[in-house]
């Protein structure tokens, strides 16, 4: 099984990328993990065209058999333990999973329509780059929960 986080944009500030990279490295001990970034539609920012362009880029990165899970503010809110259980179910199915994170304008309707699941990382509205860090950390935490390791206390 492989889990991929497919996200719009890069961390140009350098604030989050080191932590995301560290958790991605740690995840590699448990499963195949990949972070895929697609470009932001900067010229169209704030317009309906931005969502469409970014959505098309996200969809183009998906494999035909990947389970698609989107991060969405209206998605299921899970505890870390419940998220670990969700990851366990994905692993039991043996299906690759793509977790999609939209840009600052959100996700295009076409992307939401392709989603098999929707997850919320918080009730707070988070910068999408911060949401990426939270998601990757929670994936790592889920793996340690499933293995009974002491990271999650």
UniProtKB/Swiss-Prot annotation:
An example molecular function term from Gene Ontology annotations: rRNA (pseudouridine-N3-)-methyltransferase activity
PANTHER family xref list: METHYLTRANSFERASE, RIBOSOMAL RNA LARGE SUBUNIT METHYLTRANSFERASE H
InterPro entries listed in its UniProt record: Alpha/beta_knot_MTases, RlmH-like, tRNA_m1G_MTases_N
UniProt superkingdom: Bacteria
Keyword presence, Iron-sulfur: no
Any single Gene Ontology cellular-component annotation: cytoplasm
Keywords carried by this UniProt record: Cytoplasm, Methyltransferase, rRNA processing, S-adenosyl-L-methionine, Transferase
Alphabetized NCBIfam families for the sequence: PRK00103.1-4
Function (record text): Specifically methylates the pseudouridine at position 1915 (m3Psi1915) in 23S rRNA.
The enzyme's E.C. designation: 2.1.1.177
Catalyzed chemical reaction(s): pseudouridine(1915) in 23S rRNA + S-adenosyl-L-methionine = N(3)-methylpseudouridine(1915) in 23S rRNA + S-adenosyl-L-homocysteine + H(+)
Species assigned in the record: Anaeromyxobacter dehalogenans (strain 2CP-C)
Name of this protein: Ribosomal RNA large subunit methyltransferase H
Annotated family: Belongs to the RNA methyltransferase RlmH family.
Chief location: cytoplasm
Enzyme class: transferase
Subunit text: Homodimer.
CDD domains: RlmH-like (cd18081)
Compartments in which it is found: Cytoplasm
Amino acids binding S-adenosyl-L-methionine: 71, 102
